[in-house]
């Protein structure tokens, strides 16, 4: 997330005219009360026009003060003056003060050349009129010894006349922050209310406040890691700084570290506890953030909407409404009945709120993030609060699931039970109208607008690249991800490199992938980082990192040696080149695994479920032993193995045909097909049907690999390891071997070369496999002219 320049041109027309194609006018696909359309009282959203609101003498606005002596170490006060004085003026409940965020939005409406210059009275009056403020506060400050002198003027916006002037001296740098309390009293020419705590910026330390300002600026441009660094520094300097706790909670909300959720809650709670001296608006925003962090999104929305009702231009409050509606859209409230649920939030309202934020401030980049999040997934899944013992979320009959269906320019999202008839109907409806494709395309348009608005900010490039991968446009994805510079935040650089590693795997670019892997290795900090690095290293024949991770996880979880050894076999099984001893390790693990021996494979209580990797992805290996399959399996990934164990060729063929059909259907709507074709391919090889196997291999490599590919195998328990990348070399190698066996030598050469490219620097453990591939490639002879 590289630092970006503030955008001064209007937001791209595509975003303002048809943001996502999802406007508040079409929020009826999910009514405010969660019921299906039509909704009572629904009204069309009106397009914004730059019409000045009516001036009110009870509305005040503070614009940046002028550094009259141009003292470099006081430059920070130019923008800080707005925040500091606004906070102190905001203690009075009988006046309204335009928040500093909105002041920044209005400043961007000035000609670019004027923004960096000292503001004239005409500039100030124009800004005040745009905000409907009848009272304008402008000021100058001068270096006086070690401190500063402030001369602050109050103007009547209607007449342009100065109403009063206030002068205040601060003796030293540490007293600068405290200067704004007496300035506020002088500006208002009124005694403070009895319960007001003036000077309530939340800190008395200038250095802490400066770190807070830098952190807030970074957060607004979505440089999350940078924001976290500065905000933590602010709290290290002053642990009681409520506003720094609040902004750090917001920043932690966007991080991916496992402990970030706990940190978000802790900082939101600290901000709430320390916020007693802050103005009512800031206290309300903090309490809304605490509610979001606590999962109380309806309460958060209630508080944020109160702020919006008071000030319809309060960007931060509007953004908070979008946040709580978005997260509430992943929570189930009181269900309509046993088969039909109701979300606590509404994604159409969330999109409308984020749309409003971006119309007011195109540089408020976090508003882009959740819009993309809402349009990217095919479904919303809500696991039960009280899960069925021993049953995973996806298999739990109490799970709620909602297919994200696009209807015109809105989303229709209704949670139903996965076991009920409505889920299938939703999926068919979404397939028929290509909801997934249209939503991804809409999300990409938003990401493109975000890239423009942020002037190629790193986070926007990351999301654009990810969406292009999901749409199968690898060249465009790589182009976007390559633009993420070394000055971007570490988190964004790591994610960008991971996506580029996937592209390199899909393109069979071994040398390029190894360079990216080396770059990723230099950015590793956390345990999660090392696990993800190991997951990607598998593709390039690097097994030692994944073996180290498995041994560490096994030791931490006290796995029996048999489980550790079997898990060490899994990477090669997924690559399609299993070690010859894996069958022995498989049986040894099954004998000591916990759970029932006669049961439905796929259930967590069944010991055979532990053998999913080898039973599903090494089904073509000749066996002398099978675990018991006398009970029907729970989950399709075991069905081919069950059919083979029972010598039931018809059952195997039936499973393969279902998988092949489902894979094609998923691909048509760009849904992750969970390695259905890879499973079917293994079954075809197991029954000796080479022509069918080649057909599956060609579909997998030509049609599926250009898209985001899902292996359908979860990660190692207790860690972030996942095996999705291993599918690329596996499918390429199978394609090469099948083409060679059926006489397509030229095609076989192509696919052997791709595998050899990926494994150009494979570990010693894989070198015998690499030698065998080279020999098979050489046996094909030279290419035909």
Where are these regions (language model features)?
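A structural "domain/chain start" motif
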Residues: 29-95, 103, 204
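Short coil/linker segments at helix-helix boundaries
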Residues: 208-441, 445, 711-724
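"A position-specific structural signal for the A-helix of alpha-solenoid helical repeats
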Residues: 206, 213, 247, 286, ...
């Amino acid at each position: 997330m590289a630092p970006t320049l503030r955008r001064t041109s209007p937001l791209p027309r595509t975003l303002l005219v048809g943001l996502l194609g999802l406007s508040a006018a079409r929020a009826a696909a999910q009514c405010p009360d969660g019921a299906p359309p039509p909704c009572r009282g629904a009204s069309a959203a009106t397009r914004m026009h730059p019409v000045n609101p009516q001036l009110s003498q009870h509305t005040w606005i503070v614009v940046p003060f002028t550094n009259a002596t141009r003292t470099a170490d006081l430059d920070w006060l130019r923008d800080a003056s707005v925040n500091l004085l606004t906070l102190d003026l905001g203690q009075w409940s009988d006046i309204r003060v335009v928040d500093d965020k909105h002041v920044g939005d209005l400043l961007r409406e000035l000609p670019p050349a004027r923004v960096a210059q000292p503001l004239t009275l005409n500039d100030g009056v124009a800004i005040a009129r745009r905000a409907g403020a009848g009272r304008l506060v402008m000021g100058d400050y001068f270096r006086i010894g070690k401190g500063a002198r402030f001369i602050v003027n109050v103007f009547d916006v209607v007449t342009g006349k100065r109403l009063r002037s206030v002068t205040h001296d601060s003796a030293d740098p540490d007293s600068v922050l405290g200067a704004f309390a007496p300035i506020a009293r002088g500006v208002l020419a009124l005694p403070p209310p009895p319960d007001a705590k003036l000077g309530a910026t939340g800190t008395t330390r200038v250095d802490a406040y400066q770190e807070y300002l830098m952190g807030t600026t970074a957060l607004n441009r979505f440089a999350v890691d940078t924001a976290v660094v500065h905000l933590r520094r602010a709290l290290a300097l002053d642990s009681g700084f409520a506003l720094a706790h609040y902004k750090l909670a917001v920043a932690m909300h966007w991080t991916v570290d496992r402990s970030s959720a706990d940190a978000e809650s802790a900082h939101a709670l600290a901000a709430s506890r320390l916020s007693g001296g802050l103005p009512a608006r800031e206290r309300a925003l903090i309490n809304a953030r605490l509610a979001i962090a606590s999962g109380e999104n309806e309460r958060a929305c209630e508080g944020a909407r109160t702020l919006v009702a008071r000030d319809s231009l309060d960007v931060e409050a509007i953004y908070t409404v979008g946040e709580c509606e978005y997260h509430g859209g992943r929570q189930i409230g009181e269900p309509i009945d046993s088969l039909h649920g109701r979300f606590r939030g509404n994604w159409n309202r969330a999109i409308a709120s984020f749309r409003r934020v971006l119309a007011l401030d195109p540089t408020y980049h976090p508003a882009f993030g959740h819009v993309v999040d809402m349009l990217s997934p095919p479904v919303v899944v809500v696991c039960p609060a009280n899960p069925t013992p021993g049953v995973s979320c996806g298999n739990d009959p109490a799970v709620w699931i909602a297919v994200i269906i696009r209807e015109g320019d809105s989303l229709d999202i209704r949670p139903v039970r996965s076991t009920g008839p409505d889920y299938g109907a939703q999926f068919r409806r979404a397939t028929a109208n290509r909801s997934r494709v249209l939503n991804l395309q809409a999300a990409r348009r938003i990401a493109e607008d975000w890239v423009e608005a942020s002037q190629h900010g790193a986070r926007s490039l990351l999301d654009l690249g990810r969406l292009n991968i999901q749409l199968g446009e690898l060249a465009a994805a790589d182009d976007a991800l390559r633009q993420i510079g070394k000055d971007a935040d570490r988190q964004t650089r790591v994610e960008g490199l991971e996506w580029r590693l996937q592209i390199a795997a899909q393109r069979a670019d071994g040398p390029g992938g190894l360079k990216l892997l080396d770059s990723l290795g230099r950015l590793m900090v956390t345990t999660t980082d090392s696990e993800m690095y190991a997951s990607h290293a598998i593709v390039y024949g690097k097994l030692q990192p994944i073996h180290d991770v498995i041994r560490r996880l096994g030791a931490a979880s006290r796995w029996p040696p048999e489980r550790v050894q079997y898990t060490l076999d899994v990477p090669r099984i997924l690559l399609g080149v299993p070690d010859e001893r894996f069958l022995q390790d498989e049986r040894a693990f099954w004998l000591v695994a916990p759970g029932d021996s006669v049961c439905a494979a796929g259930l967590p209580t069944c010991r055979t479920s532990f053998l999913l990797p080898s039973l599903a992805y090494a089904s073509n290996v000749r066996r002398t032993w099978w675990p018991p399959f006398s009970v029907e399996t729970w989950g399709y990934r075991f069905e081919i193995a069950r059919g083979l164990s029972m010598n039931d060729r018809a059952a195997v063929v039936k499973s393969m045909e279902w998988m092949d059909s489902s894979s094609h259907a998923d691909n048509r709507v760009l849904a992750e097909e969970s390695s259905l074709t890879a499973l079917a391919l293994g079954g075809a090889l197991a029954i000796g049907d080479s022509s069918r196997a080649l057909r599956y291999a060609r579909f997998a490599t030509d049609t599926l690999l250009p898209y985001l590919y899902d292996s359908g195998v979860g990660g190692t328990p207790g860690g972030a390891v996942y095996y999705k990348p291993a599918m690329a070399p596996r499918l390429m190698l199978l394609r090469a071997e099948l083409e060679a066996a059926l006489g397509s030598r030229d095609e076989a050469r192509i696919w052997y070369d791709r595998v050899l490219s990926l494994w150009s620097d494979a570990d010693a453990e894989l070198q015998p496999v690499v030698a065998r591939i080279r020999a098979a490639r050489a046996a094909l002879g030279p290419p035909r002219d």
